[in-house]
C-alpha cells in the first residue's frame, strides 16, 4: 500500500516547483475562461485515473487550487493532475494476514476539506468516503459554468444548509443533463457503497462527445 503521506512529501518536495512554474492551476483557468455549455473541460481524469483509485485512499480536499492542467502548448494540457495529498486518508487497510478490508468509519470525524467544495456529509463531520470526493468533483464541474450559489457565503452553517436544501435541477440548470444523472447517483451512495465509476465515466464521456471534445 502506498501511503498518502509519502505521495504528498514526494510531490511537495520534488515537483511542486515544476507544477507552479509549468502547470496552470484549474483555479486560474476558471478565472480566465467561462466554459460554454455543453463543454466542461474533461475532469474525468481526476477521478478515474486507475492509479488514483487503486491506492485505496480518498483525497478529501479536491478543489481547483489542488488541480492543474498540463503545460500549455503540450499534449498534457488535456489532462488534469491532482496534487496536495496532505489531507488524504486511506479507506482500505492491510491486515497482517488476510485480504485488504475497508477501514471502519468513525462515528464523528474532524472537518477536512474546503467549505465551497466539500460534501454535506463533510459539513456534518461524518467519515468521508469515495462519494465525498465525487461531490467535490461535481461542484467543480458546476463552477465551470458559473459561480456556485454559496460562493460568496462565509458562514459555515449557511453553506451547509444551502447544499442540503438546494434543488439539484436548480443547481445544474446551466449544465449538461448528464450531470443531473451524475448527481442523482451520488445521492444513492454512502461510505460503504462503491460508486459506479463506469456509469459516471460514461456520463462525462457523453458530455465531451456532445461538445466534440476528444478524450485523448
Regions found by a protein language model. Give the residues of each.
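Terminal C-lobe "cap" of eukaryotic-type protein kinase domains
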Residues: 187-215
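Conserved structural core of kinase catalytic domains
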Residues: 1-40
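Catalytic-loop of the protein kinase fold
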Residues: 35-36, 52-75
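Conserved C-lobe activation region of Hanks-type protein kinase-like domains
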Residues: 72, 114-116, 120-176
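Conserved C-terminal C-lobe helix
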Residues: 174-185
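Activation segment/activation loop of eukaryotic-type protein kinase catalytic domains
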Residues: 67-112
